[in-house]
């Protein structure tokens, strides 16, 4: 049963649905009366269906009379969508789920596939049991780091908020040690832009040794992970909303 209370210092009490809905509607209208029509908004989570999200925005627009509505699908994905579009020309990922079956070395960063995406997590585990190597970049010791029959080759247990420093340090190793595929870059990328990036990332301040104190990732571990990803065959990166 729904529960309501008139003040925060009062105990909750169970009521029927009609009373609960009327209570919420009255309180929301009171807020608008005191603070203006735009004082109410709504945001839906990734757990909501398209239909539920549609109904929430319809409630906000038609009942409350404003456009203060948003969804986690935009809030959470807009940074990655923008960067993917400027880097690859499309705001969608470049790989589908089937790609994991052709991967030789995989980076999982800011994601916990076995908990959040169990179907994909199962396929990834299957590929790892077949011999693919795994690099986990996550402050937490997620299931993929070590579980029955699989173990990550490297777990970069970085401090929260240092994703950019860790990725930059990996790029530093790959570029300064000449592990990048120059032919591929010349054919498929903007070579002049890459030259600018290579000069930037080769700066010693991006080295694993320089960033170790910030990220908490030992320089030797980070260098080994970067070398594995650059030389391990078909590489794949799967990221989640943790980045």
Regions found by a protein language model. Give the residues of each.
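N-terminal export/assembly segments and adjacent metallocofactor-ligating motifs
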Residues: 1-179, 192, 197, 218-222
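Active-site phosphate/pyrophosphate-binding segments
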Residues: 170, 188-243
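Short, flexible loop/turn segments with low-complexity composition
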Residues: 180-189
């Amino acid at each position: 049963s729904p529960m309501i209370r008139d003040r925060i210092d009062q105990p909750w009490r169970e009521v029927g649905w009609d009373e609960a809905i009327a209570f919420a509607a009255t309180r929301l209208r009171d807020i608008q009366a005191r603070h203006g029509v735009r004082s109410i908004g709504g945001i839906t989570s990734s757990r909501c269906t398209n239909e539920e999200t549609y109904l929430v925005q319809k409630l906000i627009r038609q009942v409350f009379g404003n456009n203060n509505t948003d969804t986690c699908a935009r809030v959470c994905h807009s940074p990655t969508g923008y960067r993917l579009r400027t880097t690859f020309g499309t705001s969608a990922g470049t790989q589908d789920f089937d790609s994991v079956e052709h991967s030789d070395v995989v980076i999982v960063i800011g994601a916990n596939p076995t908990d959040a995406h169990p179907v994909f997590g199962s396929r990834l585990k299957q590929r790892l049991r077949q011999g693919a190597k795994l690099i986990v970049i996550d402050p937490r010791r997620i299931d993929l780091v070590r579980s029955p029959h699989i173990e990550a080759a490297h777990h970069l247990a970085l401090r929260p908020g240092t994703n950019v420093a860790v990725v930059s340090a990996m790029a530093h190793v790959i570029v300064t040690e000449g592990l990048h595929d120059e032919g591929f870059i010349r054919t498929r990328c903007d070579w002049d832009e890459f030259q600018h990036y290579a000069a930037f990332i080769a700066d010693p301040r991006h080295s694993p040794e320089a960033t170790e104190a910030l990220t908490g990732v030992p320089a030797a571990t980070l260098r080994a992970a970067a070398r594995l990803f650059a030389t391990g065959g078909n590489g794949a990166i799967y990221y989640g909303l943790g980045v």
